[in-house]
């Protein structure tokens, strides 16, 4: 029996946003400046983000515009030594999600520029961003990834800043699967010669396309813009 979970060092690092920042900096990968809240002395210009070191799905996240807001929020937090301050970078219109899958014989990367509505991805377009692809390969290789992780970033000018990495299957797994990025199936099949989940391995990951969420997702492969 196999449980699809990443290695302990990967889970431990990426569930902690402060440790995520440290390891990205050690790899010379751009990431927003990040400081523990109880050590913050306004080293970062406002606006700033306050969030839990361990939060998921955007919970316990506050955008703070000035010192008064900072003090007000600190007064409402319990155990605020468990919180971090992070530089606010870019805009929500320039947010990207990248998934990297790696096993003993393969390494695959896919990136979407996405729009969020109510915490869900309402629009996702495949983008060939070489910087993000390179970052994903560096992270996967240096941490000896065996499985799948999800990387969140924002574009500022010509640069990308990674602000979060999720060491689990992300909510875009269904979208990825429709563009031949079958990280769940690849991971399952990597443990057995019989390839329990049948897919056509000759189908390459799509290089272009987009998904739109209405009542359900609609998928468009290629560069056709007529249906946008």
Outline where the language-model segments fall:
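Short, glycine/acidic-enriched loop or turn micro-motifs at the edges of active sites
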Residues: 54, 90, 167
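Glycine-rich phosphate/pyrophosphate-binding beta-alpha loops
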Residues: 58, 115-124, 166-180
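Peripheral (often C-terminal) accessory segments that flank ATP-dependent C-N-forming ligase machineries
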Residues: 185-228
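Phosphate-binding site of ATP-dependent enzymes
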Residues: 65-143, 154-155, 159-161
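Conserved N-proximal alpha/beta basic substrate-recognition cap immediately N-terminal to
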Residues: 1-34
